[in-house]
């Protein structure tokens, strides 16, 4: 492989789910400074559900997106400051505000079958001169050809890159391979492809490696795997594998290891790992950020988290339906004869 990988860190966006969107701007600044010094190419900063994601439904943040982004911008020298926007949550006005604060790259995220709602936001980002990626979430929930058709739509709106986004950590290597190949078959040669993996089935590094072997150039990863569910692709082992494979990148392995162990792990109030709950996310194909919501419902209503997650998967809930987790817990308690 001769193409240089673009390593996109998501510790301070997807990782927000792991700490219930509670982190100080000071800690954001320290992590950004460490990532920047370690040579990552992009650093994504926002509430876990993107710009303006702080709410009762998704979970309020300890600070505003703007406070986090300002802290990041003040500690950035080389990396591309990035954010996430979900149309219907974040608005064009918020995208413009983020741009004024120094954000130069945005990932516009939709459910895997709803790319059409991203047209205006992608168009505005291009108008601002930003680097733009389309982010097709829960990519396991549709077929490879159907997903590729959605990727083609995002490309037509102006996306420079489109991601296979395994939000549920449900894809296996064949699933990743099929989707990347389907993208490559329909996307223009100049359009990049990205991979966003989760660790719920312990496959995030393997899936990311397979994606790169199939031509992916942008790889999402995070310090210590800090992210929703069992976490994202942990950046340290992925970079180690990239080194062993001889792939070109700009990241320094030891510096990333130090940042993961010294700065990120101490912030976690719940270990980010594969355990009985997070494995169930991947097994059931459930949106990884539902974990903390399901755990809260389990504690409140006395239903096993795994039982809740299996029912969430059976019903096919997608991002934005967090409020239904309580309804599911109540239904399960009623079926079990509880009051």
Swiss-Prot record:
HAMAP family, alphabetized: HOA
CDD domains with a match to the protein in the record: DRE_TIM_HOA (cd07943)
SUPFAM superfamilies: Aldolase (SSF51569), post-HMGL domain-like (SSF89000)
Catalytic activity: (S)-4-hydroxy-2-oxopentanoate = acetaldehyde + pyruvate
Catalytic class of the enzyme: lyase
PANTHER family with a match to the protein in the record: 2-ISOPROPYLMALATE SYNTHASE 1, CHLOROPLASTIC-RELATED (PTHR10277:SF9), HOMOCITRATE SYNTHASE-RELATED (PTHR10277)
Residues the record lists as binding substrate: 13-14, 167, 196, 287
Alphabetized GO MF terms: 2-isopropylmalate synthase activity; 4-hydroxy-2-oxovalerate aldolase activity; manganese ion binding
Residues flagged as site, Transition state stabilizer: 13
Species of the source: Rhodococcus opacus (strain B4)
Active site positions: 17 (proton acceptor)
Segments forming domain Pyruvate carboxyltransferase: 5-257
Record keywords, A-Z: Aromatic hydrocarbons catabolism, Lyase, Manganese, Metal-binding, Plasmid
GO biological process: catabolic process; L-leucine biosynthetic process
Pfam family, one: HMGL-like
Family affiliation: Belongs to the 4-hydroxy-2-oxovalerate aldolase family.
Sites where the protein binds Mn(2+): 14, 196, 198
Listed name of the protein: 4-hydroxy-2-oxovalerate aldolase 6
EC number: 4.1.3.39
